[in-house]
């Protein structure tokens, strides 16, 4: 490698400074004479420069080694016959490294990412009190939505994608018109942080859960609170509605999951088994039923339907799969080294993906109850994950302030 005259001068003076700082007097004098260096050296300018250059080289070497490892793994996958997206069923597509896009723009940790149900855009929310809209295919930033005065905790679209709901630590829920990007209404009534929000399938009602230990049902047209669900003994972290709109699930700091009837408004079941705060829940689509039945050894008589099934993730590092009808935990998925923060089912039903504070996302093959792939996804806690219902993309968000788009194949 050929150094420029300026680089040569920097190197000579940096070596001289190093010899001087180490007390190598004889070597220093000889080096000064051979390298034509004046007797006096500007200590401030060159102090520690050689050590800094050396540590920079070490860091770059490590980065190169990491990149080489990722390249080798990708090459090995291709050469060992891992099917490409064109040659395998979409039911078998799973996210693979490296990420397609790494999106930056938020000034504080990412709290939620969600795909739009129709358009090729996604929305992210952050502790910086803002929401950002991105084109997940191109990676382009489109616009920022502002209105909350504290951390935005959760996001949800209605089935048409015309409305976006956001919940916040400012104790409010906002409903946004996703065509004009204006806040249509602000829902007030919770007494603490509103940690979760979701629409009922009809789009007529909205549910929100809060640190005030309650779940509220809101009429979307009027913004009125029409019912207040009580039963959890601590912070209600998440609320989720079954695809047919008949049942609601909620999870809490009280280490339980509750199943509620939305017609009678009664708590039907309390699911116990986790040993710490239950951070997240997700209803399994019907496409998962056959794989969950195989995994649990359940034989379903002809003409009968199984399920519904629910997944829960906890700070105890465990994911549990529940039969909601019997209130039984069918099996547990163990493998994360830290809190489980997010869950998303593959639309094809074979896989469940999870996000964790161990900085990874894991892809679980439900039939065999095993982790089939683990991705080092972020440089800090992975707080949220979403799996597109029809396109081959997964998105994740992290405390490292980035959102990543992963392509599936």
From Swiss-Prot:
Q: Name one Pfam family in it.
A: LisH_PAC1
Indicate the segments forming the LisH domain, all copies: 7-39
Species annotation: Trichoplax adhaerens
Keyword annotations from UniProtKB, A to Z: Cell cycle, Cell division, Coiled coil, Cytoplasm, Cytoskeleton, Microtubule, Mitosis, Repeat, Transport, WD repeat
Identify one Gene Ontology CC term for this UniProt entry: nuclear envelope
- The lineage's top-level taxon is Eukaryota
What Gene Ontology terms describe what this protein does at the molecular function level? dynein complex binding; microtubule plus-end binding
Task: Return the Polar residues bias intervals.
Answer: 75-92
Q: Which SUPFAM superfamilies match?
A: Lissencephaly-1 protein (Lis-1, PAF-AH alpha) N-terminal domain (SSF109925), WD40 repeat-like (SSF50978)
Q: What is its main location?
A: cytoplasm
Residue spans of the WD repeats:
105-146, 147-186, 189-228, 231-270, 273-332, 335-374, 377-409
Assigned protein family: Belongs to the WD repeat LIS1/nudF family.
Biological role: Positively regulates the activity of the minus-end directed microtubule motor protein dynein. May enhance dynein-mediated microtubule sliding by targeting dynein to the microtubule plus end. Required for several dynein- and microtubule-dependent processes.
- Per the database entry, which stretches of residues form a coiled coil? 56-81
Name the record gives this protein? Lissencephaly-1 homolog
Record remark: domains:
Dimerization mediated by the LisH domain may be required to activate dynein.
Q: Does the keyword Oxidoreductase apply?
A: no
Q: Where in the cell is it found?
A: Cytoplasm, Cytoskeleton; Cytoplasm, Cytoskeleton, Microtubule organizing center, Centrosome
Q: Does the keyword Lipid metabolism apply?
A: no
Location of region: Disordered: 75-105
Q: Which GO terms describe its biological process?
A: cell division; establishment of mitotic spindle orientation; microtubule organizing center organization; microtubule sliding; nuclear migration; vesicle transport along microtubule
